[in-house]
């Protein structure tokens, strides 16, 4: 394995530099992920133009890759082995607080960079913190014991697995928050990635009528919405 890792580092608003970091020595309960896919989220675009803090950051929080090196304790706890392809959630909770015990680790203070300057969250944590590799826009990603990983099923490509985050948002917003279910009538305003993900979620949930709205410039996305299961699409500019 190489001695250094190349990463794209946000160093200022709208500015990226390629930097080398030392390949970290992982503890027995840690691992290194060789990054295959790192998605670009709408949040990334916003944070790139207006960073919330000045520290250098390796962005990228929608990450899929292969376990390149793993400590024994890590593999035993996670049920993973070197060579396994995994999707990594961007929240790194403490697993001790009330939120973590409820399974809502995204609300854990240990991963909330807005209130905790020492928080760990992929794509948001300063590259100055130990192990440095806290974002997917790099060759490798560091996985501590409390990283949330999901094995990618055999036959699913890294590119396809990279859609897990937006699709998960669609499932949560449509099914959990809005309560969409069998025979529901649904209006989705906007055929962006999140809106299209909700089309998939609503269709699978058994919605009887799915309507998606957009503008003339969304013509291709509205067409895709139909392919994904929308019953009607409406161009609101016509």
Give the location of each predicted region.
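Nucleotide donor/acceptor-binding cores
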Residues: 5, 84, 183-184, 208
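Short Gly/Pro-enriched turn/cap motifs at secondary-structure boundaries
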Residues: 11, 22-23, 54-60, 128-133, ...
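Residue-level recognition of beta-strand termini and adjacent short loop/turns
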Residues: 12-14, 27
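Glycine-rich beta-strand-centered segment in the early N-terminal region that forms part
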Residues: 24-38, 51-101, 105-106, 153-155
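NAD(P)H dinucleotide-binding glycine-rich loop of Rossmann-like/cofactor-binding domains
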Residues: 96-189
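Hydrophobic/small residue at the entry helix of a nucleotide-binding pocket
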Residues: 169, 194, 217
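Adenosine-nucleotide cofactor-binding segment
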Residues: 188-191, 203-238
